[in-house]
């Protein structure tokens, strides 16, 4: 099993976690060697997806109020609340969470079209701004 994150962290079980690109590079080279395929051939098998990220300043006193209101607003979308609020659809996902290091919300979306990813982030940011500005209507 392989897991990764945007900051470059890669975990390969049972090997562990590495925070540089050498492990990922080694895995790609190993796949190229064992499959006999070029990098372009490997990449062509992956779907083209667009990711958009936004950081939204949010006072620590309001972060969890925003997340709770967002979760309630999207209750029909079966939110995953293990780390903030994550919504998943067939074609896209959206994740809103508190930063662990700064007074802000991190909003991330991924979709097969750039416009869809941007729209998801824009809508979540607007929702959060209404709460942080005191205009809580959803």
Predicted stretch roles:
Residues 1-138:
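Phosphate-binding and adjacent anionic-ligand microenvironments
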């Amino acid at each position: 099993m392989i897991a990764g994150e945007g900051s470059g962290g890669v975990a390969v079980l049972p090997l562990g976690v590495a925070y540089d690109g050498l492990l990922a590079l080694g895995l790609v080279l190993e796949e190229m060697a064992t499959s006999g395929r070029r990098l372009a051939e490997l990449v062509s098998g992956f779907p083209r997806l667009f990711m958009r990220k936004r950081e939204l300043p949010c006072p620590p006193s309001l972060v969890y109020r925003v997340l709770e209101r967002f979760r309630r607003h999207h209750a029909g979308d079966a939110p995953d609340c293990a780390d903030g609020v994550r919504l998943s659809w067939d074609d896209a996902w959206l994740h809103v969470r508190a930063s662990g290091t700064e007074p802000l919300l991190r909003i991330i979306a991924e979709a097969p079209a750039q416009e869809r990813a941007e729209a998801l982030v824009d809508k979540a940011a607007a929702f959060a701004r209404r709460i942080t500005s005191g205009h809580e209507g959803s």
